């Protein structure tokens, strides 16, 4: 599978946003440290565009807009409530938001995921489910086609540093 990278930078004083194509239907915007921003996963379904986490980098909303030129329905799935994952939520266009109960307390919008939820969007099968986490309680995982599973910070190193 060929991975294609696109660089996007409107904010010259900050890290560049990099869009990396995983396959025909899945891309992600790589995380940045200036400002701190999580991975943003974009799935192109037949009916909708699905976004897992919206990051916090100010260039992400513009980049997401270029990925959906036909203005298809946009569904956002939030892994958890930390700002580097939800910071751009109210800066992008979306039709529905799916998240855990604790994240809902921060967004006050959308659907709360408390058990497995399944969607079919053309050839793409989507599965949202609660994920216990030591990093942030109430994480929601996002599985695509039983091949990829996105966890946000659901699996997270408790300590940074060299393991040697």
What are the roles of these predicted feature ranges?
Residues 1-24, 42-57, 94-164:
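Metallo-beta-lactamase
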């Amino acid at each position: 599978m060929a991975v294609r990278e696109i660089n996007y930078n409107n904010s010259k004083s900050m890290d560049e946003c990099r869009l990396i194509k995983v396959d025909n239907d899945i891309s992600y915007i790589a995380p940045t440290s200036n400002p701190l921003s999580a991975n943003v996963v974009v799935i192109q379904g037949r009916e909708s565009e699905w976004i897992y986490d919206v990051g916090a980098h100010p260039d992400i909303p513009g980049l997401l807009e270029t990925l959906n030129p036909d203005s298809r329905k946009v569904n956002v799935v939030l892994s958890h409530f930390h700002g580097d994952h939800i910071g751009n939520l109210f800066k992008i266009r979306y039709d529905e938001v799916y998240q855990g109960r604790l994240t809902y307390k921060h967004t006050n919008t959308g659907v709360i995921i408390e058990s497995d939820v399944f969607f079919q969007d053309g050839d793409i099968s989507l599965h949202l489910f609660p994920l216990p986490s030591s990093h942030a309680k109430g994480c929601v995982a996002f599985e695509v086609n039983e091949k990829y599973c996105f966890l946000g910070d659901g699996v997270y190193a408790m300590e940074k540093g060299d393991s040697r």
